[in-house]
């Protein structure tokens, strides 16, 4: 089961989130049938949103949009504070050449664009922030958002590793944040450790990558595990929700669907689930509108 571990240095100077998101990204790949580069780009966005959602309280909903002008198109993810995330990538078929070590490239092909976050607290006034894509690697773009919009200096690492068949092998990441009151000496020590950390892809390839990430972040520094919470890919779509959407259409449009297509098929963008509405269903909707 996927999980996020929240921890804090015993000194109180830093906190870290470490994630195993393997099943989340694997299920997203399965539902959207994504090729290698699309899988990694979508996976990184899902992991970034899992981190962002874990930082919120209450029943907030968090939307992350990675909008680039490349062949990926846009990437949309929605998460809640209970560990659930869903998402899709506009172009599922991007399969760009890999590096000599087999890593999938994303950043050089993302193009120009923006990292957009929308945090809905349920009050009717969602908070929206837009920052430019800095590298297109998504992790660095997320870190830039946290620094610029939330005024919280953060180190982010996230990635998706694929096997020889381009299926998800492991996915995960981390976030380290400076907390108020950290001394310059403590900050310098952590900056040095982060600079010396092995690449995120190397740590994810470890036998137990969650422990490997924590060890790389803290080293000999004492720390406390604050919580361990489950994560999952879960879509909240339903037939009732799409039925309500159809009810917003004019009766003439519903009748046209009956006449031309003998009903309607609606496919959820986030999970690919198909909902069929036959002629009888459509006629019932028209009668309900009458």
Curated annotation (Swiss-Prot):
The gene is hslO. Keywords: Chaperone, Cytoplasm, Disulfide bond, Redox-active center, Stress response, Zinc. This is 33 kDa chaperonin. Belongs to the HSP33 family. PANTHER family: 33 KDA CHAPERONIN. It is found in: Cytoplasm. Its main location: cytoplasm. The keyword Cytoplasm applies. SUPFAM superfamilies: Hsp33 domain (SSF64397), HSP33 redox switch-like (SSF118352). Redox regulated molecular chaperone. Protects both thermally unfolding and oxidatively damaged proteins from irreversible aggregation. Plays an important role in the bacterial defense system toward oxidative stress.
